[in-house]
Amino acid sequence: MAAATNRFRALYSSSRVATPQAGSASYLSYRGYATTDPSSATGGASTAGKRRTTFTDKLNAGPSFGDFVSGGRDNAPLDPSEAYALKTALVGPAGRKKEMTRLPSWLKTPIPDSKNYQRLKKDLRGLNLHTVCEEARCPNISDCWGGGDKAAATATIMLMGDTCTRGCRFCSVKTSRAPPPLDPHEPENTAEAISRWGLGYVVLTSVDRDDLADGGARHFAETVIKIKQKAPNILVECLTGDYAGDLEMVGVVARSGLDVYAHNVETVEALTPHVRDRRATFQQSLRVLEAAKKAKPSLITKTSLMLGLGETEEQLWDALRQLRAVNVDVVTFGQYMRPTKRHMAVHEYVTPDRFELWRQRALDMGFLYCASGPLVRSSYKAGEAFIENVLKKRRSGAPEVSHNTVPVDEATR
């Protein structure tokens, strides 16, 4: 036992490391605990062995604590061009950082997670229905789907599947030359879902189906007819494609019983070849809107343009003049937001005051209604209450409300 104890003591004493004494050479390179006083005369030598970081360098070169408390060295407010300038940030690990565009605070929206959102999503999945809200990654989905009850919610049903035959540079909907065949039960299922929700106003849209002889126009029309059979008082807006310029098919949809015929020109004429699929042209879209109005003059016709793609003021003026020339009633303006890195980049973030300016200009040109704001989309609910009111007054024969009575904040919500 004594021998074992002696061996243990020998091993213990040989493994001990002497603690450096203050003033010795070894003490200068000794790394102490976090409580070691860094203000000693040897502090400069001890920091020399520590790894400096970029963050530390930036912090040391930045404003002092006094500047932070006082609000900074320059308290002058930013002008709008500075406040809403296109900003970027480097994201990712060192050596592989990528420059990404940062959204202004007024373009950020909450992640959808309300009970009504989940309930509405479950209903759609149960009936095998798709919405453009999800497929196009609309930023307003939490607002439109998150109402307190289903009657207050707005969902834009996307017909004819979730795969488009075209590939516009701004759109995140899936594309294929040969998408799946149409679901013959979709018109009935769509009508059932809409009648179940008890909505007063519904928006239907679709992918482009250039693989079909009629572009899917008869499928679209059948859906509208079945909705009107199940819910005669519901107001139906249809946001359609251009049917490859086949105006006869435009008439089929326009005479199916819908109340609002919408077709988006998306951007100004000069940018159309760079933004939309090569099979879509600005003039073809104008002919679609004109044909819908001629097929049923009582229809409200509607279109939408994205801003922030690099358009000029004169190009926007020209687009609005051409739209009024074919008697388009409603126009909406919204900010283009890049859905993924594969899509075309944002040229600029347009300020809210510019959206308001174009709203007023559109109304002054004679448009019945204009919804204009960074988060406004063609089927956003901001305009539906007004359009619904106009349609009901037309049915009853009452005079329509002048567009000058529309509150400014309603169009930019």
Swiss-Prot record:
Which cellular compartments is it found in? Mitochondrion
What cofactors are annotated for this protein?
[4Fe-4S] cluster
Write the Enzyme Commission number(s) for this entry. 2.8.1.8
The chain positions of domain Radical SAM core read 147-368
User: Is Metal-binding among the key words of this record?
Assistant: yes
Q: What SUPFAM superfamilies does this protein's entry cite?
A: Radical SAM enzymes
The note on the cofactor says: Binds 2 [4Fe-4S] clusters per subunit. One cluster is coordinated with 3 cysteines and an exchangeable S-adenosyl-L-methionine.
Query: Which GO molecular function annotation, any one, does this entry have?
Result: lipoate synthase activity
Q: Which residues are the transit peptide here?
A: 1-33
> Which Gene Ontology cellular component terms are annotated?
mitochondrion
Question: Which GO terms are recorded in the biological process aspect for this UniProt protein?
Answer: lipoate biosynthetic process
Reactions that this protein is recorded to catalyse:
[[Fe-S] cluster scaffold protein carrying a second [4Fe-4S](2+) cluster] + N(6)-octanoyl-L-lysyl-[protein] + 2 oxidized [2Fe-2S]-[ferredoxin] + 2 S-adenosyl-L-methionine + 4 H(+) = [[Fe-S] cluster scaffold protein] + N(6)-[(R)-dihydrolipoyl]-L-lysyl-[protein] + 4 Fe(3+) + 2 hydrogen sulfide + 2 5'-deoxyadenosine + 2 L-methionine + 2 reduced [2Fe-2S]-[ferredoxin]
Record: residues binding [4Fe-4S] cluster 1: C133, C138, C144, S379
Pfam assignment, any one: LIAS_N
Q: Which residues bind [4Fe-4S] cluster 2?
A: C164, C168, C171
Q: Mind telling me which NCBIfam families this protein's record contains? A: lipA (TIGR00510), PRK05481.1 (NF004019), PRK12928.1 (NF009544)
The text of the family note is: Belongs to the radical SAM superfamily. Lipoyl synthase family.
Q: What name is this protein filed under?
A: Lipoyl synthase, mitochondrial
